[in-house]
Amino acid sequence: HIIGTDIYFDVEFHSWTSNNSGGGFSYTRTPADGPDLPDGYFRKPDFADASLPENQDRVSDDIWITRGNNQALYHAAFEGSYNYNGGHSHTGGPSPSGTEWASGPTENHSSIESYNTFLGAVGGEWGTENLAGQTYSMHIIGTDQYYDIQFHSYTMDQQNGGGFAYIRTPATGPEIPDGYFRKLNYGDPNLSFYQDRITDDVWITRSN
């Protein structure tokens, strides 16, 4: 299967040179019909390179969700790995930056104040053990965009590959009052998500 597409092939191998003897191989590749992928489905396989676009859920031009070979989700356009940014190792930092999360479907929430960091919403690192089968609400900070994130898998334990899969479905979330601004705990004050940019040269934020 070609990730991010509906293209599948049957690959019948004819030869494979082993024992470091040259790396030769041969096969016949035949187009095939594979399973339909639900709209909004995304999967990063274990040990897949998180820096590659096909292993990032590019929600928008500047929101790219992925995960390294361990730890939690992060935002690949602004973060090179999960960012604690001073947060406790078990309760976590603001990653993935630019997003905030709440437990359960978006329709369950009537106030933006119920949203938290990803690890804050799932109950810390230990909470990720039970992500498969659970639905969380994700809000894109600074917008009225909400999504229901239904997790199908989430590889646990350190150095086991960092794989995960979910279906992301647009949802209607709580209205945000005009002029409302909030910086999450441990949000990086150098990022625009955590600055109230009142004018081109007046940006209000706060350090940790």
Which role fits each region the language model picked out?
Residues E12-H14, S137-H139, Q150-H152:
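Residues within well-ordered beta-strands of beta-sheet-rich folds
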Residues H1-I2, Y136-I140:
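Short conserved beta-strand and strand-loop elements enriched in small hydrophobics
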Residues T5-D10, T143-D148:
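Short coil-to-beta-strand transition motifs
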Residues Y27, Y146-Y147, Y154, Y166:
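Aromatic side chains
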Residues F9, G23, G162:
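Residue-level signal for beta-strand positions within conserved beta-sheet cores that form or flank
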Residues H14-S21, H152-G161:
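Short, exposed beta-strand-loop hairpins at the edges of beta-sheets
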Residues T17, G142-T143:
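Short loop/turn positions at the edges of beta-strands in beta-sheet-rich folds
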Residues H1, S18, G24-A132, N160, ...:
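N-terminal "domain-start" segment
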